[in-house]
């Protein structure tokens, strides 16, 4: 069984493992004996964004993430904060996540911080919502960076600078871990990290 999102409860993985059905998680954390994980390097991605902000001289910046319990959001936020100690960072966490959450959070964040120069969103959907929310409010549009590189990120109205996940390599490692686990269920838990890269587009040059 490969679990690819944060939505299914961990109890589902525990149930499969109890039946000795191999489980591999993608971009999710769990300390479960015999459960393998493969994740994008969230910390590397956040550092790439922070370094971009630093090179551009942006010092008043923001972060929008999903809820604090979300594994990927937490890793991206912590690495970003650690890398931006010389910047003023304002943050928002959204219970729902997704486009509408980004739409509302960006409007609130920029209204409270009118001099904001750049905004890092923990997912592309948050970032796309942020762009539209600020445009609709006729608010100043800071540089905006997302994370994922979903197809919509390259759409003309957005041209979103983002951190690209290597989905092909994530899938390759997930299948490899699963097949090995099928052959040897008693192996210790294993974890692999997949590098990411920054894709520069118009939203944050």
Predicted regions: what is each one?
Residues 1-51, 109-115:
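Alpha-helical recognition/docking segments in bacterial nutrient-uptake
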Residues 4, 26, 64, 120-121, ...:
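Short hydrophobic segments within beta-strands
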Residues 8-9, 69, 76, 125-127:
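Alpha-helix capping/helix-boundary segments
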Residues 15, 19, 75-86, 101, ...:
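Alpha-helical structural signal in soluble globular domains
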Residues 38-63, 99-108, 127, 165-184:
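Hydrophobic alpha-helical segments within soluble ligand-binding/sensing domains
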Residues 47-87, 92, 190-204:
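An alpha-beta-alpha
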Residues 88-112:
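Active-site rim loops that border cofactor/substrate pockets in soluble metabolic enzymes
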Residues 88-89, 110-205:
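Flexible loop/turn connectors
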């Amino acid at each position: 069984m490969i679990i690819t999102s944060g939505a299914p409860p961990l109890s589902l993985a525990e149930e499969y493992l109890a039946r000795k059905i191999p489980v591999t998680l993608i971009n999710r954390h769990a300390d479960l004996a015999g459960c393998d994980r493969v994740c994008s390097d969230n910390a590397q991605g956040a550092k790439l964004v922070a370094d971009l902000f630093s090179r551009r001289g942006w010092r008043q910046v923001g972060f929008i993430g999903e809820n604090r319990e979300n594994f990927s959001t937490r890793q991206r936020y912590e690495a970003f904060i650690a890398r931006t100690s010389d910047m003023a960072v304002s943050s928002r966490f959204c219970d729902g996540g997704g486009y509408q959450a980004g739409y509302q959070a960006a409007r609130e964040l920029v209204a409270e911080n009118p001099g904001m120069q750049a905004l890092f969103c923990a997912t592309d959907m948050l970032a796309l919502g942020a762009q539209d929310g600020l445009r609709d409010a006729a608010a100043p549009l800071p540089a905006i960076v997302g994370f994922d590189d979903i197809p919509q990120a390259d759409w003309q109205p957005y041209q979103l600078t983002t951190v690209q996940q290597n989905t092909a390599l994530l899938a390759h490692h997930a299948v490899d871990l699963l097949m090995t686990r099928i052959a040897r269920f008693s192996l210790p838990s294993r974890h692999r990290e997949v590098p990411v890269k920054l894709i520069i587009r118009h939203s944050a040059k």
